[in-house]
Amino acid sequence: MVPVIALVGRPNVGKSTLFNRLTKSRDAIVAEYAGLTRDRQYGEAKWQGRTYIVIDTGGISGDEEGIDAKMAEQSLQAIEEADAVLFMVDSRAGLTAADQMIGEHLRKRNKRCFLVANKVDSVDPDIARAEFSPLGLGDALPIAAAHGRGISHMLEQALGIFPKDNADENAEGEEGGELAEGEEVVAEGQEPKRIPGPSEKEGIKIAIIGRPNVGKSTLVNRMLGEERVIVYDQAGTTRDSIYIPFERDEEKYTLIDTAGVRRRGKIFEAVEKFSVVKTLQAIQDANVVIFVMDAREGVVEHDLNLLGFVLETGRALVIALNKWDGMEQGEKDYVKTELERRLFFVDYADIHFISAKHGTGVGHLYKSVQAAFKSAITRWPTSRLTQILEDAVREHQPPMVNSRRIKLRYAHLGGANPPLIVIHGNQVDAVPKSYTRYLENTYRRVLKLVGTPIRIEYKGGDNPYEGKKNTLTDRQVNKKRRLMSHHKKAEKKRRDKKR
């Protein structure tokens, strides 16, 4: 399970700055899509090959009222469910009453907590450690989030408490590397062959996610139908999501449910308690995400936040618009227009209009799940990907840079789930985003991929002679001397004739 780290602290101690620094490598992917909100409180981050989730819990000062009090309540819930907490304090401002209140709360919860003293660029780190020692949370880890100082040491301490996972099944491979289990190889003129792997043995893992009260529990119960099995908690802490294995049409699946517990033999609908931690970890652990939205409410900001995280992780995606029944035709037309306008950045995902309560359209979700999973794990040979690249360049050439044409030479697969296509060429740093989008759409169309994002990475061509010196043999040196002597004599004769 991917660890979740919560950033905790009163307002203006630098949580957002640290969040942006930790997640910047992944934020760049989402930032390419206009219309996708940048104001997110959670993101995926990587450090030394390890993946983890960061949650910015927002500022807690202890005197919140109204909507701020509700936000503080959600922050405390995130703290409760996180694997570890980075408690941030401001070295310049010193110890405050709000710091003491938060510190007392963390001590009572017996959380894995690391005290982080930010803004030490103008304060002696030893003084900062002494200043915050009354909190009773150990020595403070000094950092300067704005400049990146102390971040590596902080992460070494925070992530060191978690066991290192085995190789990620979604890890990106190298050209010519061994085929991962469960993936397909497709060669020209051949039918794809399946290689049984762990994903097929336990079934496609499907995460049902969405805002509270959009019908996730109803959809899970409808998908399980009468073939439900005994519900059990995955080994771990009580905050873990529920993993429900089942079969349909001789295909194995595992539903990852974050909405609530059902009782065997009857449908038990409880008020859904939305958990950010459960949702984010379910996305990370899934092969395919079914994103449930309320058709009557349309697209709201929180939907975009969650979709942004799905896009970051590269998971295959199916969108389900629930509560479609009973809507007027004019309302349906408006919702479809809004989906096309606001969700264009995930236009690769199949959209289903369903009624989880009555079962309308639910059965069609499985076909999209299967297609998305297959698209996400298929592997293609270098020759095939290069041919598609050459055809795309022939049809629409990349732009000129400094009077020179960008050259894209060949492509190969760098990883699967999601497919990563590595393109080699010259001046690749100058390839515009619009042209990358053109290549993505071309690969998607030709390879007939659905439900999965495609990532393209460029690599510049290295000069094989750079840094090398041409060393002459003795024979070559003597020959060079004779030629130079001959040229000098010929030049002298030419000058003498002119006289």
From Swiss-Prot:
Pfam families referenced in this protein's UniProt entry, alphabetically: KH_dom-like (PF14714), MMR_HSR1 (PF01926)
Binding sites annotated in the UniProt record for GTP 2: 210-217, 257-261, 322-325
Feature: compositional bias, Acidic residues: 168-186
GO MF annotation, one: GTP binding
PROSITE patterns per record: G_ENGA
Binding-site list for GTP 1: 9-16, 56-60, 118-121
Entry-linked InterPro entries: G_ENGA, GTP-bd, GTPase_Der, KH_dom-like, KH_dom-like_a/b, P-loop_NTPase, Small_GTP-bd
NCBIfam families: GTPase_EngA (TIGR03594), small_GTP (TIGR00231)
Similarity section: Belongs to the TRAFAC class TrmE-Era-EngA-EngB-Septin-like GTPase superfamily. EngA (Der) GTPase family.
PANTHER family in the cross-refs: GTPASE DER
Protein name as catalogued: GTPase Der
Originating organism: Stutzerimonas stutzeri (strain A1501) (Pseudomonas stutzeri)
Gene name in the database record: der
